[in-house]
């Protein structure tokens, strides 16, 4: 059976934690930041975890990411 291919777009966007949770960058942080308040921009700066309902579909894109 051939090796499974990793989706390269997903590999650039998501990282797995030690406990197999998936980290992602917050959305709404690219442009038009002037109308967003400083508190909101600070909150959007960090990484967030992917919701449980999306976990399985991302794992299918990255078969070797899960430990």
Curated annotation (Swiss-Prot):
UniProt-recorded Gene Ontology molecular function terms: structural constituent of ribosome
Entry keyword set: Ribonucleoprotein, Ribosomal protein
Xref: Pfam families: Ribosomal_L35p (PF01632)
GO cellular component, one term: cytosolic large ribosomal subunit
GO BP term (any one): translation
Tree of life domain: Bacteria
PANTHER family to which the protein is assigned, alphabetical: 54S RIBOSOMAL PROTEIN BL35M (PTHR33343), LARGE RIBOSOMAL SUBUNIT PROTEIN BL35M (PTHR33343:SF1)
UniProt family annotation: Belongs to the bacterial ribosomal protein bL35 family.
Protein name (record): Large ribosomal subunit protein bL35
